[in-house]
Curated annotation (Swiss-Prot):
Substrate binds at T11, A12, I13, G14, K15, T16. It comes from Lactobacillus helveticus (strain DPC 4571). ATP binds at G9, P10, T11, A12, I13, G14, K15, T16. Monomer. Transmembrane segments: none annotated. Belongs to the IPP transferase family. HAMAP family: IPP_trans. Catalyzes the transfer of a dimethylallyl group onto the adenine at position 37 in tRNAs that read codons beginning with uridine, leading to the formation of N6-(dimethylallyl)adenosine (i(6)A). GO terms for biological process: tRNA modification. This is tRNA dimethylallyltransferase.
Length: 306
């Protein structure tokens, strides 16, 4: 079975830097596990590796789509699987640098995501129409009736996950939660998780947002805002929608920046919760342990020799 190394953790913890360092030392190539880094129009807000970093180590699933393309978790899994096969054929180590927990999980494990795109999109359209007419609470109520265990793990505002669960239920006729329990691994994988003191992570997140503003975050957000009438996933991405009130003249720029920092901190907390509850992660602290990377490499070498 193909071995795959995954690097996960909250935003701003240093996943990209570690993935690049490990790729150089372990003869690896990187597959982005972030659902937003595929879009070539958005650079700053998605915190992609720089062009220089991408030149040093080959990256897959970065800048491969337009924000106006349809792109599902199934598309991600199909493309990432192809990338991992390519890397494996070169006798290199595939390194998944991931931020989006469900995408990472769906790739590493055989989750039911639909066999044909037509079926998947058709069923989803039904629930998207229902959401527009009735709102997230009533959508979630339906999931709660059909599958209370699945609903318990999905917050009411997360309509996309609610629709995904309902889509799987419609397509298979089985509870989403039951299918989640029967997951089989797709690869022989090792997951390295980065985490540290919460306040330090929050401080780094605040600094990252400030740097993003200096690099042109507002221009990217304006592009997304100007195209808000078109259906695309980036509309819901943290880093863009927080600035819509500024463009509407409802809030000051500083208020929106603070709102983005708050949203990013909450997202980091949700990331940690998902990885802790859904995946077998080996945790390390890169901010307080000077020997962190050496320990990680020892962990990886032991796994590679199994």
């Amino acid at each position: 079975m193909q071995k795959v190394l995954a690097i996960v953790g909250p935003t701003a913890i240093g996943k990209t830097d570690l993935a690049i360092s490990l790729a150089k030392k372990l003869n690896g190539e990187i597959v982005s596990g972030d659902s937003m880094q595929v879009y070539h129009e958005v650079e700053v807000g998605t915190a992609k590796a720089t062009k220089e970093e991408q030149a040093e180590v080959k990256h897959y699933l970065v800048d491969t789509r337009s924000v106006f393309d349809e792109y599902s978790v199934k598309d991600f899994v199909d493309e990432a699987t192809e990338a991992i096969n390519d890397i494996g054929e070169k006798n290199k180590l595939p390194i998944l640098a991931g931020g989006t927990g469900f995408y990472v999980n769906a790739l590493l494990n055989k989750m039911q995501l639909g066999e044909r795109k037509e079926e998947d999109s058709g069923t989803s359209q039904k629930w998207e129409d229902y959401l527009k007419q009735n709102g997230p609470q009533k959508l979630w109520d339906i999931l709660n009736e059909k599958d209370p265990e699945a609903a318990k793990k999905i917050p009411v505002p997360n309509s996309r996950r609610t629709m995904r669960a309902l889509t799987v239920i419609d397509r298979t006729g089985k509870k989403f939660s039951q299918q989640q329990k029967k997951i089989e691994p797709r690869y022989d994988y090792l997951i390295i998780g980065l985490n540290s003191d919460r306040q330090e992570i929050y401080r780094r997140i605040n600094l990252r947002v400030d740097r993003m503003m200096q690099k042109g975050m507002l221009e990217e957000a304006k592009f997304i805002y100007q195209n808000r009438d078109k259906e695309h996933q980036v509309l819901q991405a943290i880093a863009y929608k927080e600035f819509f009130p500024y463009f509407k003249g409802e809030k000051t720029l500083n208020e929106c920046v603070e709102q983005l920092k708050t949203a990013s901190r909450r997202y980091a907390k949700r990331q940690l919760t998902y990885f802790r509850n859904q995946l077998p992660v080996n945790w390390f602290d890169p901010l307080n342990d000077p020997d962190c990377e050496d320990k990680i490499i020892k962990n990886i070498e032991a796994w590679k020799n199994e």
